[in-house]
């Protein structure tokens, strides 16, 4: 085991029994051979479960939609990448030469994916309790600042944060029609989300309101919220 990996283990707060599992978690798909995508898939599922379980216990009065919004904030790519930078994770990644030259070790999505892969690797190397303990320790500061006030953000912000938590492209809004007299117009907007086959629609007395309605419809279509949240 190299000194560099030992240093990373100290930062993570976990020592791997199987070093190959750790190396695989740090291997981007641009690198020759096996990569961390399967571990990332597993780690993402574990992270979402652990975050959801912790929120369920922490906020017993919260509604489903509120819990979903809080979880989206906790597990979004921006948050995970910030944690990864705190571990200097980019210094340990195995990247292909092209990705390395383009600064992939600094890229938010690559850092976030690698952290999820490490979660999956810890689970396989140890057990669920150990993975849970590490996740909660890493996210302790994030949990400390959470309140239900955070769920009062507008639908566009909530949709954006949800998509970021899934490393998806941001939604695109388009005004498709404007009806009525200049002093009493109704704006019709479509919202395109990569996870949905159909565009969500909204209307309102201003473009901003119509976009908010379309975003709210998209959240419902995604199953993140329901009409009562």
Curated annotation (Swiss-Prot):
Its cofactor is Mg(2+). This is Ribonuclease 3. Digests double-stranded RNA. Involved in the processing of primary rRNA transcript to yield the immediate precursors to the large and small rRNAs (23S and 16S). Processes some mRNAs, and tRNAs when they are encoded in the rRNA operon. Processes pre-crRNA and tracrRNA of type II CRISPR loci if present in the organism. It comes from Pseudomonas putida (strain ATCC 47054 / DSM 6125 / CFBP 8728 / NCIMB 11950 / KT2440). It catalyses: Endonucleolytic cleavage to 5'-phosphomonoester. Coiled coil: none annotated. It is found in: Cytoplasm. Gene3D superfamilies: 3.30.160.20, Ribonuclease III domain. CDD domains: DSRM_RNAse_III_family, RIBOc. The gene is rnc. Its EC number is 3.1.26.3. NCBIfam families: RNaseIII. InterPro entries: dsRBD_dom, RNase_III, RNase_III_dom, RNase_III_sf. Residues 5-127 form the RNase III domain.
